[in-house]
Amino acid sequence: SGWGRVVLVASEDALQPYTDEMPYCAAKAAVLNLAKNLSKAYAKDGVLINSVSPAFIASPMTDAMMQKRAEKMDVEVDQAIDSFLDNERPHLELQRRGKVQEVAAVITFLCSQQSSFVVGSNYRVDGGSVASVAV
């Protein structure tokens, strides 16, 4: 038996779709399905495949989103972020953008020996953003 770890990156949007992000949501939902299918195909070979679903992480992608929002609203970026959290992500309980390091910590665990009984799972790194018990 071999040994390996694969972690696919999806998004909160895979579990909690938004009408203004339909193509992105559909693509990220497909990532979850792919991870689950691959996990079933390769677990017997010792290759454990899982996924993570981050939400609103401070990154170049969300920086650009918030810059565009700030320009549209004619406000500073910090105000655009606050507006986004209040109006678009009211269930994000921590009321802040996540950090890349927080997602990396979960991925590091999933790539370690400590995750030897974790396969086909999706870990939400979402600050409480997904307003359901969906898995």
What are these model-predicted stretches?
Residues 11:
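Residue(s) in the substrate-gating loop at a strand-loop-helix junction
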Residues 15, 54-64, 68, 72-73:
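Short, flexible catalytic-loop segment of classical short-chain dehydrogenase/reductase
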Residues 16, 107-108, 119-135:
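Short C-terminal tail/terminal secondary-structure segment
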Residues 16-22, 44-45, 95, 113:
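Active-site loop immediately N-terminal to the catalytic Tyr-X3-Lys motif
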Residues 27, 35:
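Active-site helix of classical SDR
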Residues 42-44, 57, 111:
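A short hydrophobic alpha-helix cap/turn motif
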Residues 51, 75-114, 118, 127:
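C-terminal helical subdomain
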